[in-house]
Amino acid sequence: MKTKIPDAVLAAEVSRRGLVKTTAIGGLAMASSALTLLFSRIAHAVDSAIPTKSDEKVIWSACTVNCGSRCPLRMHVVDGEIKYVETDNTGDDNYDGLHQVRACLRGRSMRRRVYNPDRLKYPMKRVGARGEGKFERISWEEAYDIIATKMQRLIKEYGNESIYLNYGTGTLGGTMTRSWPPGNTLVARLMNCCGGYLNHYGDYSSAQIAEGLNYTYGGWADGNSPSDIENSKLVVLFGNNPGETRMSGGGVTYYLEQARQKSNARMIIIDPRYTDTGAGREDEWIPIRPGTDAALVNGLAYVMITENLVDQEFLDKYCVGYDEKTLPASAPKNGHYKAYILGEGPDGVAKTPEWASQITGIPADKIIKLAREIGSTKPAFISQGWGPQRHANGEIATRAISMLAILTGNVGINGGNSGAREGSYSLPFVRMPTLENPIQTSISMFMWTDAIERGPEMTALRDGVRGKDKLDVPIKMIWNYAGNCLINQHSEINRTHEILQDDKKCELIVVIDCHMTSSAKYADILLPDCTASEQMDFALDASCGNMSYVIFNDQVIKPRFECKTIYEMTSELAKRLGVEQQFTEGRTQEEWMRHLYAQSREAIPELPTFEEFRKQGIFKKRDPQGHHVAYKAFREDPQANPLTTPSGKIEIYSQALADIAATWELPEGDVIDPLPIYTPGFESYQDPLNKQYPLQLTGFHYKSRVHSTYGNVDVLKAACRQEMWINPLDAQKRGISNGDKVRIFNDRGEVHIEAKVTPRMMPGVVALGEGAWYDPDTKRVDKGGCINVLTTQRPSPLAKGNPSHTNLVQVEKV
């Protein structure tokens, strides 16, 4: 049964003023505003920091998790124990200057991670079945010997292609401790000294947008910095929620709001869920069915084209395939974008607002109004987060959303954007070299479970294998460093569980982590890692608008229990594997840091000395070019500064995609197209499976965690409870009240969790914050609220990425 959305719900104008006036959502907006004020009060408290005691040390450390920022933490230590945590106290509130980098509630709770009862204390080996969490304590020497001996046997028997480094972002901001990308880690350096490993491409965050927009712009699609919004007249955010996904100290949300105060730009948010980025600050929220963004864009494009609101001069000069004039000779007649939109292409369907309304759930008159506003307001900052791309049709949807910036000529100008996510300034700080991987073969990061189950069957044309036509061997060993993708963050947990439980398939799993995570329970050998507070490192790679920074992450306390640093672990293994000198080059961890810092000072002359930096804790530098404008050089002179696409221009029509579509072997329902068309993909709103599972389930980044990191911190779990968000209309049909325990289920699994009944969800859609720790009962019903019990391992068509937001479910009261 399809959920009918009342016209009153979707047709109503949702503005800042109207939102606050509305009883139900107004209360939510005011509640959200109260939360914002709370964080403001906490931030102002930094100015009056508590005086330190005479026996108290204040040591700079960092939170290095995968939130988009890296935040400085000033640890107050007495007698070798962290007593409390403060954040950056340098700089001011001026976003035009070297502003403070204020840690969010997660970083400020770092002490609770360091002293968490879940901390891994000793090396252990598995004594029960994988996933049971049954281990016995062993010595470090035994752990090293087991790993070295088994790995050497597996390499001898199956080759280095059988060794896999799993995806992990638990400490991706580190330098020595860096966990992502796996190819830039110390584990990769160790394996490269030993003949290499099976690599992977893509990532769980942005696989589809990276691959999709590569065929539009060439390479990773750049975006204007959020500070440039001070030059914008309009801000349109498709599934872009920096208020939660970028809520930390780098300050994307801060830049967004400060810049809008200068420009007074209207902000329109298009999202199935009313996010904290709105929270009464937006001018309009347009709820949309998940996975239908491309249909909306097509409807908008129809209005823009028929009402002459497109920038024809820009399209003629900078683009390929908008109309017949720039269509490649290899393309079929009427194979251009304009023909597709007007119904003159192969499908013969005009993409009118009425057509788009039936798919998206957005009233046609609202689509017309939005098209006219976008088409007549310039410059406009049009961007997309990474939510819309995490769908079965994600690659093609990202190309479609970028079309709004392209059609209106907003690319390469101040106040505009490319349609991609916001960009930022970065420093050329030198990272730990990991040497060259002798193995050229790679798979999608999402298909490692398939590579265990059916590795030799996986091919380039069917499964996206790169570097050779097919895999020769299955994965026989996994290194899982600082990551929870072994089970918790990987889709379709029950299938993964079945594959991993058979230790004759993947014969050795080594997990290196600080806590007993859901993934750690599947280890054969479990190695206790040091936290960032227990070792020295540099922290960087923050998305921070026009200011970049590096943090001196000093050792705050001695390693707890028998924990060791990743450098010490890999150095000891290198010794047993006969590659110690090649691996360490005779340096300790601190000596490597001093060496890398000396190289970095050559690239960044303003850096202070090592000892001065250690004392000051953070180095900040603003972009000397001012606001970052993506593709500015291309816009100014496309001949001298071509893009890296085959044509050197923006490719609306991609011949490369046409060639892939003609040669790849795709399952029924998967579509790769040279144009940014709308295709529903599998498990969409229009899928016949909707009759059995009538609700779309989507995920979102929850503010109490960074993916699954901090998911075991009690105060954060209490402050931001894990709940399933559901619209009152859907809840009423099912007899569900706020706080009721519900079961969410489909053919892949079942989750029991409390319901949050709220008008902040679009009818027909439910949502779970991703990253909650998997907690199954004896029947494998999850009680932790882990969305990946319900997600699918069927990959997206082009990137072979994770379609985590493409799910059909049913919900019932328990």
Label the model's feature ranges.
Residues K2-D7, P182-I270, T277, A295, ...:
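Extended redox/cofactor-interaction regions of prokaryotic respiratory oxidoreductases
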Residues K2-L309, G335, E354, A460, ...:
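N-terminal export/assembly segments and adjacent metallocofactor-ligating motifs
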Residues G168-T169, K317-V320, I374, N417-L427, ...:
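A glycine-rich phosphate-binding loop feature that marks nucleotide/adenosyl-phosphate handling sites
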Residues R273-T377:
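Long, well-ordered, tryptophan-enriched scaffold segments
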Residues E282-I288, S548-P559:
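Short beta-alpha connecting loops at secondary-structure transitions
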Residues K333-N334, K338-R454:
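Active-site phosphate/pyrophosphate-binding segments
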Residues E507-L508, Q555-A574:
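Phosphate/diphosphate-binding loops
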Residues I566-Q616, S708-Y710, D714-W725, L729-V814:
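Long, contiguous, secondary-structure-rich segments that constitute the structural scaffold
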